[in-house]
Amino acid sequence: MARYRCRRSQSRSRCCRQRRRCRRRRRQRFRARKRAMRCCHRRYRLRCRRY
């Protein structure tokens, strides 16, 4: 299972790439949807949650 954590020290583009991966996973796994939303939502761009 993929784990993404975007830190403020990371570049924004790197964080966005991680979010894109996370979005793909969200489509694949309906059950993980809430957690994926937390990770991928624009509001959490600089601090993605691990799951």
Curated annotation (Swiss-Prot):
Gene Ontology cellular-component annotations: nucleosome; nucleus
Pfam families: Protamine_P1
Matches recorded under InterPro entries: Protamine_P1
Flavoprotein found in the keyword field: no
Main location: nucleus
Keywords: Chromosome, Developmental protein, Differentiation, DNA condensation, DNA-binding, Nucleosome core, Nucleus, Spermatogenesis
Tissue spec. comment: Testis.
Keyword flag DNA-binding: yes
GO molecular function: DNA binding
Subcellular location(s) of the protein: Nucleus; Chromosome
GO biological process: chromosome condensation; sperm DNA condensation
Record function comment: Protamines substitute for histones in the chromatin of sperm during the haploid phase of spermatogenesis. They compact sperm DNA into a highly condensed, stable and inactive complex.
Homology family: Belongs to the protamine P1 family.
Name this protein carries in UniProt: Sperm protamine P1
